[in-house]
From Swiss-Prot:
Function noted in UniProt: With S4 and S5 plays an important role in translational accuracy.
Residue positions where 3-methylthioaspartic acid is found in the record: 89
Identification of the protein by name: Small ribosomal subunit protein uS12
Oligomeric and partner information: Part of the 30S ribosomal subunit. Contacts proteins S8 and S17. May interact with IF1 in the 30S initiation complex.
InterPro entries: NA-bd_OB-fold, Ribosomal_uS12, Ribosomal_uS12_bac
Species the sequence originates in: Hydrogenovibrio crunogenus (strain DSM 25203 / XCL-2)
SUPFAM superfamilies reported in the protein's UniProt record: Nucleic acid-binding proteins
GO cellular component terms, A-Z: small ribosomal subunit
Protein family: Belongs to the universal ribosomal protein uS12 family.
Keyword RNA-binding: yes
Amino acid sequence: MATINQLVRKPRKDKMKKSNVPALEACPQRRGVCTRVYTTTPKKPNSALRKVARVRLTNGYEVSSYIGGEGHNLQEHSVILIRGGRVKDLPGVRYHTVRGSLDCAGVDGRKQGRSKYGAKRPKG
């Protein structure tokens, strides 16, 4: 235990929390250019072809970003916006693509949870 005098001279240091999304550099989203768009398979109990883009960000980082929703229009050199949020069954994928912004189209035919996929409200 430190004495009060010791604490007055040198206060206790706060523990630093390590960021889960270091490439965002404390920003809510970042813009980047797709360098590669590909599919990959998830970890053990799951089975699928998950859509992933390798993205070179404006701050120089290169990260993998998950493309959510059914179907997408992304290809190499597409400019996209990424946000934080990992994909539990894809190791190394710690970012999500923001659908419906920049070059990434929203999911068409989406009726529920539309705001997460950049889908407009259906007519009628």
